[in-house]
Amino acid sequence: MSPSVEVTPAHTPTSYEVTNSLDSYRGYDHVHWYVGNAKQAASFYITRMGFSPIAYKGLETGSRDVTTHVVGNGQVRFAFSSALRTGEPQADEIHAHLVKHGDAVKDVAFEVDNVEQLFSAAVKKGVRVISEPKVLKDAHGSVTYAVISTYGDTTHTLIERGSYEGAFLPGFVDTSANKDPIAAFLPNIELMHIDHCVGNQDWNEMDNACKYYEETLGFHRFWSVDDKDICTEFSALKSVVMASPNEKIKMPVNEPAVGKKKSQIEEYIDFYDGPGIQHIALRTDCILDTVRDLRARGVEFISVPGSYYENMKERLAKSSLKLEEKFEDIQALNILIDFDEGGYLLQLFTKPLMDRPTVFIEIIQRRNFEGFGAGNFKSLFEAIEREQAKRGNL
């Protein structure tokens, strides 16, 4: 039976008075992708990345124009939407997005304490509105949401879940009982949550994007590096990490810098046809197991040269830091290390998940370290440049 959904406007103050609610972010809610085949995209993350079915909306639930499959792992939730036909606004929007960008992230949703108050404050400060607050209701309760624009065609949905008890959102049916039989034959993958989502900008657009987050959403500059820190023989980039007031959400923003050849950021902009989400970092508590098991499932990661580990071993020997993991295991899995005297992170990046060299996934583990792998950027860039060269895009 199709779920019954009621949609009503929320009671947003018409005066849009500034409130102190720009600090009400609870964290990432989900990442929404527009793809050509939502069923197959969801299946990829189930079989390759170890996600599980969460919820579904489509013809069987009364959604005649768009279908959405939701999958998750830990607190990570990805929603994949595809158009079922043309001639309806959202379906046509998905078609247009696919033609321009290919399969890609459309929306990064934030869970907040109070949508109406945060939206009011953001509108007063000049946020670009896509959809004013609305309330969705079904038998499991209600959810309030609003949608705002960020860079390019990317949006942020603000979601207030309250005491909602459904699997995902009103209008979806629970699919958590639909276990994929192949899971019994594959290693289990344990992820925690989304650590950060990175957006790429075109030339000289990073500052504008950062100012937008600062001025409208109350974010602040958490961390930054310039082209002197992130460069190779051939290319360079600049990066600023924007964080919500409580630092539960971090959105790094990149732009290309002048180099001898085309950088990975320029390649992304060329094939994505504009600014957008470059990668999503997924946090794990044991990256050795996670990467080993993802490789066993067929996930392809970038390669790191042996010289990186020779240099890293020398750096570690000169510091007081002690790794909990065996260095040999880290090297065997091609995992990158960054550290200071207080802690360290371990990270590794997949190859692009699409035929277009656009979106990829990062697997990250933190041990008392809140940086973003600046010490790895040169090695990472060189590894990505090797892949670019194979594609004829360097």
UniProtKB/Swiss-Prot annotation:
Belongs to the 4HPPD family. Keywords: Dioxygenase, Iron, Metal-binding, Oxidoreductase, Phenylalanine catabolism, Repeat, Tyrosine catabolism. Its EC number is 1.13.11.27. Binds 1 Fe cation per subunit. Its cofactor is Fe cation. GO terms for biological process: L-phenylalanine catabolic process; tyrosine catabolic process. The keyword Iron applies. This is 4-hydroxyphenylpyruvate dioxygenase. PROSITE patterns: VOC. Pathway: Amino-acid degradation; L-phenylalanine degradation; acetoacetate and fumarate from L-phenylalanine: step 3/6. One of its GO terms (molecular function) is metal ion binding. It is an enzyme of class 1 (oxidoreductase). CDD domains: HPPD_C_like, HPPD_N_like. It comes from Yarrowia lipolytica (strain CLIB 122 / E 150) (Yeast). InterPro entries: 4OHPhenylPyrv_dOase (IPR005956), 4OHPhenylPyrv_dOase_C (IPR041735), 4OHPhenylPyrv_dOase_N (IPR041736), Glyas_Bleomycin-R_OHBP_Dase (IPR029068), Glyas_Fos-R_dOase_dom (IPR004360), VOC (IPR037523).
